[in-house]
Amino acid sequence: MKLHELAPNPGARHERKRVGRGIGSGLGKTSGRGHKGQKARSGGGVRPGFEGGQMPLTRRLPKRGFSNAPFKVRYEVVNVADLERFEAGTVVTPELLDETRVCKNATKGVKVLGTGELTKALTVRAHAVSESARQKIEAAGGKVEVIGEATEEVK
């Protein structure tokens, strides 16, 4: 096989439609758009969900439920492995995590998760701590302090 003999598999590629090039092409004159009407015009067509002026389904059905999602507290996540960089005996606070750039917006809410290993005894202060993270920190001889609920939402 030579470089000039390379070709895609038959049927793998389609030739593009050249519209408006005579009736012999099958796509001449109206270019497959039919006659007149909104969909025949350039830029024509209706938005998704438009039902021709009839009240759309989404507005015919009643509203249901309630969502508090915009006000949900979104914690910055820190794993146990990220705490390994601190020296033994350090008190790890959200302010310290911000300063050392372990995570951004740590003061708005930090949750410590249990991925990785920890070999140093640290005192960890966070807004939330997973059970596996708590076990690993305490197994390394450290302490966990849960500080008050995060007041600001992390957006």
From Swiss-Prot:
Organism: Symbiobacterium thermophilum (strain DSM 24528 / JCM 14929 / IAM 14863 / T)
Gene Ontology molecular function: rRNA binding; structural constituent of ribosome
Protein name: Large ribosomal subunit protein uL15
Top-level taxon in the UniProt lineage: Bacteria
Entry-linked NCBIfam families: rplO_bact
Subunit structure: Part of the 50S ribosomal subunit.
InterPro entries recorded: Ribosomal_uL15 (IPR030878), Ribosomal_uL15/eL18 (IPR021131), Ribosomal_uL15/eL18_sf (IPR036227), Ribosomal_uL15_bac-type (IPR005749), Ribosomal_uL15_CS (IPR001196)
Transmembrane helix among keywords: no
Gene Ontology biological process: translation
Gene: rplO
Listed PROSITE patterns: RIBOSOMAL_L15
Protein role: Binds to the 23S rRNA.
